[in-house]
Amino acid sequence: MQFSIATIALFLSSAMAAPYSGNSNSDSYDPCTGLLQKSPQCCNTDILGVANLDCHGPPSVPTSPSQFQASCVADGGRSARCCTLSLLGLALVCTDPVGI
């Protein structure tokens, strides 16, 4: 009896110690890894990298650099960008996403 209790306790403790990865993919694509430029955007007009006009979030969650760029191009010929601040279609301080 004691052996089975010890065995059960061992299995439970090892199961509780195992890291939970959930449904996330460890190789998932994060297009905006900069310190400030954390907001992925699809923009029409770039003004010297300081301001971008007619911007909004990508139509789908980016899974790769080519998919992010293709989804923005398909959404009215926009460019994939990573911006610091976006409000009402105006995005400020934008850079190119990782891999593009």
Swiss-Prot record:
List the Gene Ontology MF annotations in alphabetical order: toxin activity
Q: What are the annotated GO cellular component locations?
A: extracellular region
Q: What does the annotation give as the result of altering A74R?
A: In strain: P1
Q: Which pairs of positions does the record mark as disulfide bonds?
A: C32-C82, C42-C72, C43-C55, C83-C94
Tell me which positions the record assigns to the signal sequence: 1-25
Induction statement = Expression is higher in mycelial compared to yeast-like stage.
The protein's matches in Pfam families, at most eight in alphabetical order, are given as: Hydrophobin_2
Q: What subcellular compartments does it reside in?
A: Secreted, Cell wall; Secreted
* Keywords, comma-separated and alphabetical: Cell wall, Disulfide bond, Secreted, Signal, Toxin, Virulence
Q: Which domain of life is it from?
A: Eukaryota
Q: Which family does it belong to?
A: Belongs to the cerato-ulmin hydrophobin family.
Biological role stated in the UniProt entry:
Aerial growth, conidiation, and dispersal of filamentous fungi in the environment rely upon a capability of their secreting small amphipathic proteins called hydrophobins (HPBs) with low sequence identity. Class I can self-assemble into an outermost layer of rodlet bundles on aerial cell surfaces, conferring cellular hydrophobicity that supports fungal growth, development and dispersal; whereas Class II form highly ordered films at water-air interfaces through intermolecular interactions but contribute nothing to the rodlet structure.
Subunit relationships: Homotetramer. Further self-assembles to form highly ordered films at water-air interfaces through intermolecular interactions.
Protein name, UniProt field? Class II hydrophobin CU
Question: Could you tell me the gene encoding this protein?
Answer: CU
